[in-house]
UniProtKB/Swiss-Prot annotation:
Function as written in the Swiss-Prot or TrEMBL entry: This protein catalyzes the committed step to the synthesis of the acidic phospholipids.
Source domain of life: Bacteria
Lineage, opening ranks: Bacteria, Bacillati, Bacillota, Bacilli, Bacillales
Gene designation: pgsA
GO MF entries: CDP-diacylglycerol-glycerol-3-phosphate 3-phosphatidyltransferase activity
Keyword Transmembrane: yes
Cellular compartments annotated: Cell membrane
Entry protein name: CDP-diacylglycerol--glycerol-3-phosphate 3-phosphatidyltransferase
Length: 193
């Protein structure tokens, strides 16, 4: 249960409160000037930590497959860690008016729904592992959150709304992958009582 990939996933979860403290610290760390734009140092530090934590998603999966250490615990914990990290970041982005609340609500609602689906089916002995659309969704969310945490830099220097477009792509894949999880598991869900 506590093999290397699962320990990496647990480390990702442990980084979430540190990320939140950096982002929500009640003091001003100053701003970093980039051309005509600027970004709060706390947001830059938070973005770097978020990107590091997000990268562990790839690392734990790589080692799980390479070392043949894929476990049901890991199949459950890995997507949960992703959801916790991304949800914490999205809520903070809303607080700083860097993301529209309705988009964050759509993303987090889907995450709760799919987690609920996984929990119900786990009670019947079925494990709902991440599929390709779910993985694309996760990376789309990570890219969007990273770009938003960075205040759209460096794209802001050329007035290209990369962060906004990335968030729209993330919402799209969030909804589509959620639909796929439920449609593929609907029969199992109906017979789970």
């Amino acid at each position: 249960m506590f093999n290397l990939p699962n320990k990496i996933t647990l480390a990702r979860i442990a980084l979430i409160p540190i990320f939140m403290i950096i982002m929500l610290a009640p003091f001003d760390w100053g701003r970093l000037e980039v051309g005509d734009e600027s970004i709060p140092v706390a947001h830059l530090a938070g973005a770097i930590l978020f990107i590091i934590a997000s990268t562990t998603d790839w690392v734990d999966g790589y080692y799980a497959r390479k070392l043949n250490l894929v476990t049901n615990f890991g199949k459950f914990l890995d997507p949960l860690a992703d959801k916790l990290l991304v949800s914490a970041a999205l809520i903070i982005l809303v607080q700083f008016d860097l993301a529209p609340a309705w988009m964050v609500i759509v993303i987090i609602s889907r995450e709760f729904a799919v987690t609920g689906l996984r929990l119900v089916l786990a009670g019947t002995g079925e494990v709902v592992a991440a599929n390709m659309l779910g993985k694309i969704k996760t990376w789309a969310q990570i890219i969007a959150v990273s770009a938003l945490l960075l205040h759209n830099l460096p794209f802001e220097l050329v007035s290209f709304p990369f962060a906004d477009l990335a968030l729209w792509v993330a919402v799209f894949f969030t909804v589509v992958s959620g639909w796929e999880y439920f449609s593929k598991n609907w029969e199992a869900l109906k017979t789970s009582n």
